[in-house]
Amino acid sequence: MEFAATADRIIVDGAPDFSRFNIVEIVRDSLQIAHISVIEISMDIAHIIPGALTSKTMGQLAELKDEFGHSYTVHLPFWSVELASFNEPVRKGSVESIVESIRLAEPLEPECYVLHSTGSLAAEISRLNYSKEMVNVICTAMAGFSARSVEEILTQTEIGPRQIAVENIEFPFEITRSIIDEYDLSICFDTGHLLAKFSGNESIFDFYKTHKDKIVELHLNDGTYKNVEGVSVTDDHLAIGTGDLPVHDFMIELVKDCFQGPTIFELTTEEVKQSLQKIRTVVPEAL
């Protein structure tokens, strides 16, 4: 669920009313949308909205599977989390947050856990106006801290490494891929992030073909990138068909490969419906 939509639910007359937020009912409503059979639970909710995600809530969400026959994926916390931090207390606290979330979400039996292996600090460093070589050196050093965090997460939770799907975010993905290979992790491919050139300059097809051996989940959304007088202007998490995504050709590629992994729309409800209608019109065999 998008943050703005969540805020609209709980803010009344300028003040938050957390009693208005019920994740079980939100999931139930989402499953009424045609073609939606996988729900991704954002574990940041547990920290943003007190009492919204508890062991009891997780049990109720798990029971919904008997009613609707759907499955879950889990997006592990990323706000205020930095697994690549060189500040050890911050790094260890980030690991603890991830581990707690995995344990809390276990009753859902998620298909995978989506992980940001680097956070906002690493993203900021990746944007530094230094030489590409210097930025790569610093990012590689931060990836070393991230790798240590991943190892600790796997050790403490004892989950299979391929259950961890590392998302392409604002950080050089060729560096992230080295962590994925080292620990035999999986990949969550966010199309909008790539279209906005957050994780690299490859085309959608080049990224997919290079990494499809590891891709187990899609965050399917549109995005744009423009260079305006030397300034990068980007947008992501757009409804399908409103950005630069080659909808027909990319979806056909997925159909040819018989991709069966979870496909998640990180969009508002109306944008999800708009996106599904676009896919239904352009490439109905993908639904």
Predicted feature locations:
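Histidine-acidic metal/acid-base catalytic patches
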Residues: 2-3, 29-30, 83, 111, ...
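A cross-domain feature marking catalytic cores of carbohydrate-active enzymes
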Residues: 5-9, 14, 41-45, 74-78, ...
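Alpha-helix-loop-beta-strand connector modules within alpha/beta enzyme cores
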Residues: 58-79, 145-157, 245-253
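A structural motif
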Residues: 35-36, 105, 110, 161, ...
